[in-house]
Amino acid sequence: HGVASRTKLAAPLDHLPQGELLLRGDSVAFPPDGCAYLHTHQGPGLRCLIEGGIRIDTHGHSTSLGPGGAWFEAGPVPVFAQAASDRQSRFIRVMILPAALLGKSSIQYVNEDDKAKPKTQSYKIFADMPIVRKAP
């Protein structure tokens, strides 16, 4: 009958600039043993693993997550992601990005060598919606 929801994770977004931005909802899938090389994004976002397993390395710490596990990435802080070795893994995320990234990737690799390496992750964008953040 109705849709029930509960908050898994919340993060303040006070530091976002005012003006035109982009709200993106997408998913990222990895084959067994896939990884996302050390990278940053051009904006913050919440993630939730919906299949498989993943280890997130950031801020000098490693966190292993199973289905339902949620985490926040600030954007400019480098992150390395290692998917489970024995099964496909997938997470969904919502990010706030610069408006200029409409339809474009937000990932930026930290190490020059990683830019040319084959990437194992695949993306599916569900929503790319321009939004405006007004002054409080």
Label each PLM-derived region with a short phrase.
Residues 25-27, 46, 70-72, 93-94:
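Conserved hydrophobic/aromatic beta-strand scaffold that supports enzyme active sites
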Residues 33-45:
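A short beta-loop-beta micro-motif enriched in histidine and acidic residues
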Residues 1-21, 66, 104-136:
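A short, N-terminal "cap"/entry segment at the start of jelly-roll beta-barrel domains
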Residues 1-6, 74-104:
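Ligand-binding loop in jelly-roll beta-barrel domains
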Residues 42-61:
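Glycine- and acidic-residue-biased ligand/ion/polar-headgroup-sensing regions
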Residues 3-36, 94, 98:
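A short glycine-rich, His/Asp/Glu-containing loop-to-beta-strand
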Residues 30, 58-79:
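Short acidic-glycine-tyrosine-enriched beta hairpin
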